[in-house]
Curated annotation (Swiss-Prot):
Ranges annotated as spanning the membrane: 467-487
PANTHER family, A to Z: GUANYLYL CYCLASE (PTHR11920), RECEPTOR-TYPE GUANYLATE CYCLASE GCY-9 (PTHR11920:SF503)
Binding site residues for Mg(2+) 1: 903, 947
Keyword Zinc listed: no
Record's keyword terms, sorted: ATP-binding, Cell membrane, Cell projection, cGMP biosynthesis, Coiled coil, Glycoprotein, GTP-binding, Lyase, Magnesium, Membrane, Metal-binding, Nucleotide-binding, Receptor, Signal, Transmembrane, Transmembrane helix
Protein name: Receptor-type guanylate cyclase gcy-9
């Protein structure tokens, strides 16, 4: 066949040259000179198939050329010119390729879309030193770089890569013996041809090859007797009968009608056709139900990985340009053609930037080399090119059942490093298998069958004597079996109703206080510097959860008021039984439930001492290293992986608050599979929220509309939020919803920010937006912080998290794939175990704590000084010191002290014409001046009442007779201060003050407990007050007792007699005016 094609290509090349020779040599030479002199003009040879379905390929090339120019991928002076000519019509493409080369000087070829012409032009292209890029052809021969050294392909699938993917799937299931069904002619172009070479290198035996004549009907296939041969030699059968879907349909109908198909047979169908919207059972003129049955339990391998959003966006853009809405097949073809030109543009840019100059597009081999070993995001998703410039697509295997295809294994494309490629060219690229579903096969175990049945292909390898013995026992079993089974069910039911998880109320002892060492995260009253951190209890994963002890085990509990007796249905009894026996290093232990006692319903989990991940991650004072984040993320994934493979099946309410940390810094998932049960009983009024005396709510489950509950539910999948918002109920949950929530948890662990922190919306608004979103434009998801781009998290990990947030639940990755991705992309940076890292961090923390203690001590000392200053301003210093040390302050009588009163003349008039703020400002300014004067003397300000000011000297510290001198000096300075004092709001106002003082015995003591005041009592205080009230403005009136002290002991003071005045309660008293003082002592 290949020799025939080579012969045809030689004849066509000769014919092309004869056609071209008809044109004058002068015309050719003149045209070539013109074209070669135009630097930067890239002439594109487009060989357009005659298929009318894809008639708009030239428009697609123009779209891509415009995009390359707009995105500055092409150098500035480059221009793309497209020449479109017919192909795939009696080898017209070969003639037109020659025409484009010799007369148009084409720099690159796109197409043709048919294999026969591609094989010919692909051999001519290296002779002309131009690259040729296929976007539809998938022939196995195209990967031969000896014959096609300048050929590249961006086709969504190819025979060679499909063969590699098929071998990967065979190896995944340990199938080492297979059969192949292929067409009797033309199979060289299919993946089965490449598959025959691939399996020889992978130790897979090919037991049988079945050739089927083209266009054979099911009856004709059965009549050949070949199916009997197939049955006797293979159970794993790879079926590929060309691009025509009807050939495969007829073969599968023959298998179905011959009744040789059962769960021992696996038919693997590599599907090269791209018409994914057209399944065999949707074709016309077929019995759709029979075709569905014929394809049931087949495995279909097809291209996978292009996002539907890319498809829809391209279709809209194409429609806007052409006004045509292309069908599915045409759109995929157009998208591949777009990617082909985009790949060429990238290669051309790289060659130019490497110094190729503006004529670099004439060097086809150099351009081709830049198309190898690279990847980019194209219209069909991620385009991964191997060392042969052939696209390595990702594939998926689908299980067909009842007309529905479900992905069971994803085969992810991957380029290996250059070292592996140099050792073995076949290892330059590979497919990595990710199982998405297990136990789906219709066998008793749900597992896929082995390559060879237990008794061989013909059944001759088994000894059937045990079956005869078994038959003799069958009667006995049929007699005794039902009775035994009935006893077994009764025993199982009894165990179910034993309720090993039920805890007697009398064995539970409530702990009123929360231990600082064990639950410091639950209260703000703890020191924020403790290693466990601190958070408001409303933000703790163990919110309401009081602590209790049962049989020596410390528990976190949630309490509810029980309205009436509770009876659990069997489904809930099974759930609680599984909860009780469920144990894993990354799951918190469910301790049990106490109910139908003391009108209380108590849910108990083992206490985790360090609180929740939310408390730890959002405590800014906790400087956790990357190793802790890596360990936390892996622990959460491991815990969820265990749940998804356990009888519990899912968590139901995964969030950061339900991820607890124990004393060993291991993350344990909690509250799994219980919240929906509790809410159901609250909703049926069997339970009520427990009212705590400390005003904490019982549980956010009781009301999913509360802010805290909404904060937790904000991390749930949109379908869960939708049900919470619309029905105010908590759904049971699912594995796909857990995966969405896992993405949220990983996001918060890695970046230590809350989801949607960048959106200035309330939690209510965010919940409503998530619940009501029904359009791609309305979907909102957290954004990765730009400040964390240097954290070292690669794009694969971030893409995995984004995949967890997909709107359609079925498209989210399974937990096994997420675990593989997390383990591969999250690596610890330090040496030693996490405990070693924790110990090192604690050492650093201890050093940091010393600095923190030093800083806090300094702040405390400063606060103490401020308190002392405030206390000393309220009480005499000696009295304040006694009160601070708890020494009782007893009332005391002083034989002689001097008391002064002052009062502002006209204060009432000034106050009535000023605002309250002006009055306060005025008094503050004046009394601040008085305070400054007192501070320079041995005197104490007792109190101020309005504009009245009271001072004493000689109390509480006695100072002989100096108290009279101190008060006299203060009085003179006060009068001088007032004479120069100006009101800020009435500067023209002349201020005047009355001052009076008296010397005599007084009693003093502290009065009051809440606001203690140091008060003076006695006749001396009354007399001093009368000296002020009967005085004259800007005069200092003193009593006879004060005069005698000053006159005898301090003659420097100048005093004049005023005379006798009437004093209330005293009668006539002789008083004096203090005028001033001289330097005489």
């Amino acid at each position: 066949m290949r020799l025939y094609l080579f012969f045809i290509s030689s004849l066509l090349l000769a014919e092309s040259r004869r056609s071209i020779s008809k044109i004058s040599h002068d015309e050719i030479n003149q045209h070539v000179k013109t074209t070669l002199s135009s630097e930067g003009i890239v002439r594109i040879g487009h060989l357009h198939p005659t298929n009318p379905i894809i008639a708009h390929e030239p428009d697609v090339l123009k779209m891509c050329a415009d995009d390359l120019k707009m995105r500055n991928i092409l150098p500035q002076n480059y221009t793309l010119t497209v020449f479109t000519m017919e192909s795939c019509n009696k080898y017209s493409g070969v003639e037109h390729a020659a025409f484009l080369h010799y007369l148009k000087n084409a720099s690159v070829y796109f197409g043709p879309g048919c294999n026969n012409e591609m094989l010919v032009i692909g051999r001519l292209a290296p002779r002309w030193n131009v690259p040729i890029i296929a976007h539809m052809s998938g022939d196995d021969a195209l990967s031969d770089r000896v014959q096609f050294p300048t050929l590249g392909s961006v086709a969504l699938t190819s025979a060679s890569e499909m063969a590699k993917a098929t071998v990967t799937y065979l190896n995944l299931n340990n199938w080492d013996q297979i059969g192949i069904v292929r067409p009797s002619v033309g199979y060289e172009r299919l993946s089965v041809y490449s598959l025959q070479h691939q399996i020889k290198k992978r130790d897979i035996n090919l037991n049988v090859i079945l050739d089927i004549e083209p266009f054979s009907s099911p009856e004709e296939i059965i009549s050949t007797g070949k199916l009997t041969t197939l049955k006797s030699m293979a159970r794993i059968i790879v079926v590929e009968l060309g691009m025509d879907i009807h050939s495969v349909t007829n073969f599968m109908l023959a298998i179905h009608r011959s009744e040789i198909k059962n769960e021992e047979f696996v038919f693997v169908i590599p599907w090269l056709a791209h018409q994914n919207d057209h399944y065999p059972w949707e074709a016309a003129n077929v019995d759709k139900q029979e075709v569905k049955l014929a394809f049931e339990n087949t495995i279909i391998i097809t291209a996978h990985g292009y996002d539907k959003k890319f498809f829809d966006d391209f279709q809209m853009k194409f429609s806007a340009v052409t006004g045509v809405l292309a069908n599915h097949y045409a759109t995929l073809s157009y998208m591949s053609l777009y990617d082909a030109l985009f790949l060429y543009g990238l290669a051309l840019r790289d060659a130019f930037e490497d110094g190729g100059g503006y004529n670099v597009h004439m060097n086809g081999s150099l351009i081709w080399s830049r198309m190898t070993n690279r990847q980019f995001i194209g219209m069909t998703g991620q385009v991964l090119m191997n060392n042969k410039a052939i696209r390595v697509p990702s594939y998926a295997t689908y299980h067909a059942i009842n007309g529905t295809l479900k992905i069971v294994v994803e085969l992810e494309a991957k380029n290996n490093d250059r070292g592996q490629c140099e050792k073995n060219e076949e290892m330059c690229s590979e497919h990595v298998a990710h199982e998405t579903i297990q136990y789906y096969w219709p066998s008793d175990s749900g597992k896929l069958p082995p390559a060879v049945p237990k008794c061989g292909f013909t059944g001759a390898e088994c000894d059937y004597r045990p079956y005869f013995i078994g038959a003799s026992l069958l009667a006995f079993i049929l007699t005794v079996g039902p009775l035994s089974y009935f006893i077994y069910l009764k025993q199982k039911e009894r165990l179910l109703y034993d309720m090993t998880w039920r805890i007697p109320r009398e064995s539970i002892k409530m702990l009123e206080g929360k231990s600082k060492s064990e639950h410091s995260l639950a209260s703000k009253s703890q020191s924020s510097g403790s290693f466990s951190g601190s958070m408001n209890s409303k933000q703790n994963g163990l919110i309401a959860a009081k602590q209790a002890v049962s049989n020596g085990v410390k528990l976190a509990i949630k309490r509810y008021q029980q309205v009436r007796n509770i009876t659990f249905p069997k489904s809930e009894l099974r759930l609680l039984k599984e909860l009780k026996i469920c144990e894993n290093d990354n799951l918190n232990k469910f301790y049990g439930i106490s109910f139908n006692q003391q009108n209380e319903f108590i849910v108990m989990w083992v206490l985790c001492s360090r609180g929740s991940l939310e408390d730890i991650l959002f405590n800014d004072e906790l400087k956790l290293g990357r190793n802790f984040q890596v360990s936390f993320a892996k622990d959460v994934v491991k815990g969820l992986n265990f749940l998804h493979t356990s009888p519990l099946l899912h968590h139901g309410m995964l969030c950061l608050q339900n991820c607890l940390v124990d004393s060993n810094w291991t993350v344990k998932l909690t509250n799994f599979a219980t919240e929906a049960v509790i809410f159901e009983k609250l909703d049926h009024n069997e339970l009520r929220p427990f009212i705590n005396t400390d005003s904490e709510s019982a549980d956010d489950v009781s009301d999913p509309t509360k802010d805290f509950a909404r904060k937790k539910y904000l991390q749930q999948a949109p379908e869960i939020i939708r049900e919470i918002v619309t029905t105010k109920t908590i759904p049971e949950g699912s594995q796909s919803a857990d995966i969405y929530a896992l993405g949220m948890v990983l996001y918060q662990i890695l970046f230590r920010v809350e989801p949607f922190h960048e959106r200035n919306k309330s939690i209510n608004k965010l919940m409503e937006t998530l619940a009501m979103a029904n359009d791609d434009d309305q979907l909102i998801r957290p954004t990765f912080p730009s400040s964390n781009t240097g954290e070292g998290y690669n794009l694969q990990l971030l893409s995995c998290i984004e995949a967890c947030w997909l709107e359609i639940p079925e498209m989210r990755p399974p937990i096994k794939k997420v675990r593989t991705m997390v383990n591969a992309n999250l690596k610890s940076t330090g040496k030693g175990s996490l405990v070693d890292q924790m110990m090192k961090m604690m050492e650093e923390y201890t050093a940091n704590l010393e600095n923190m203690v030093r800083d806090r001590t300094a702040l405390l000392e400063e606060a103490q000084k401020q308190a002392d200053r405030l206390l000393n301003s309220m009480l005499p210093k000696s009295i304040a010191e006694d009160l601070k040390i708890g020494k009782p302050v007893l009332p005391q009588l002083y034989s002689c002290a001097t008391v002064l009163f002052s009062d502002i003349r006209g204060f009432t008039r000034i106050s009535s014409t000023s605002t309250p703020l002006q009055v306060v400002t005025f008094l503050n300014d004046m009394f601040s001046g008085f305070d400054a004067i007192i501070a320079k003397h041995d005197a104490y300000k007792v109190e101020t009442i309005g504009d009245a000011y009271m001072i004493v000297s000689g109390v509480p510290t006695e100072n002989g007779n100096s108290h009279a001198q101190n008060i006299a000096d203060v009085a003179l300075k006060m009068r001088a201060f007032i004479c120069n004092f100006k009101l800020a709001h009435r500067p023209e106002e002349l201020m005047m003050v009355r001052i009076g003082f008296h010397s005599g015995p007084v009693a003093a003591g502290v009065v009051g407990l809440a606001a203690p005041r140091y008060c003076l009592f006695g006749d001396t205080v009354n007399t001093a007050s009368r000296m002020e009230s009967t005085g004259v403005a800007n005069k200092i009136q003193i009593s006879e007792g004060a005069y005698n002290l000053l006159h005898c002991f301090f003659p420097q003071f100048q005093m004049v007699e005023r005379g006798k005045i009437e004093v209330k309660g005293k009668g006539e008293c002789l008083t004096y005016y203090l005028e001033g003082r001289t330097g005489k002592q």
